[in-house]
């Protein structure tokens, strides 16, 4: 009985450590295990000009965590790049995003589906790579001309962990 109480109290404490992380410049919020993320900004040249690629990352320090990392990326396309009525262009962009993410890690796409964040189109997908030992779960959204990419990476044996879904599902743009 004592071990059951200890287990339940441990689970409760673990659940309580998740905190809200907000980026006012990035106009998003997400839950992370500690409420902390570090930001890096990289300039990238595209066919539409230079963009600032923002990466927010949390990497657990514990041994054998549910997820190896939690990431939110965003960047802004020039104003008007994706008119709201350009459904085909937005769908093509989302498909290309998924394909490029698979190609970037020489992985295998195991799942993908269309999703929405309020009225904004998005995608969810999973990629296995590194001899199918590692899994990346991703969501992306296009909010106006801002692109968000939310990802977690884990070992395959941890692929069903609740932390990945908690992180991905908590994302909100504001």
Model-derived segments and spans:
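A short acidic-to-branched-hydrophobic micro-motif
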Residues: 55-92, 149-150
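Short beta-strand segments enriched in hydrophobic/aromatic residues
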Residues: 76, 129, 153-154
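Bacterial Sec-dependent signal peptides at the C-terminal "C-region" and cleavage site
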Residues: 11-19
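Short, solvent-exposed coil/turn segments at beta-strand boundaries
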Residues: 63-67, 120, 140-148
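Sec-dependent N-terminal signal peptides
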Residues: 3-12
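Surface-exposed amphipathic alpha-helical segments
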Residues: 24, 34-37, 90-105, 144-174
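A short, polar/proline- and glycine-enriched secondary-structure boundary/capping micro-motif
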Residues: 41-43, 50-51, 81-84, 159-164
């Amino acid at each position: 009985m004592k071990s059951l109480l200890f287990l339940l109290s441990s689970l409760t404490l673990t659940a309580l450590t998740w905190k809200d992380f907000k980026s006012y410049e990035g106009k998003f919020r997400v839950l992370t295990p500690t409420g902390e993320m570090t930001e890096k900004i990289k300039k990238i040249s595209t066919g539409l000009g230079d963009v600032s690629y923002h990466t927010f990352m949390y990497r657990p320090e514990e041994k054998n965590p549910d997820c190896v990392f939690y990431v939110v990326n965003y960047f802004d396309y020039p104003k008007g790049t994706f008119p709201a009525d350009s459904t085909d262009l937005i769908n093509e962009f989302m498909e290309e995003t998924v394909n490029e993410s698979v190609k970037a890690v020489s992985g295998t796409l195991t799942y993908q589906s269309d999703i929405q964040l309020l009225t904004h189109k998005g995608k969810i997908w999973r990629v296995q790579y590194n001899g199918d030992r590692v899994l990346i779960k991703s969501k992306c959204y296009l909010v106006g001309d801002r692109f968000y990419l939310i990802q977690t990476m884990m070992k395959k044996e941890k692929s069903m962990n609740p932390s990945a879904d908690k992180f991905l599902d908590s994302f909100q743009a504001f």
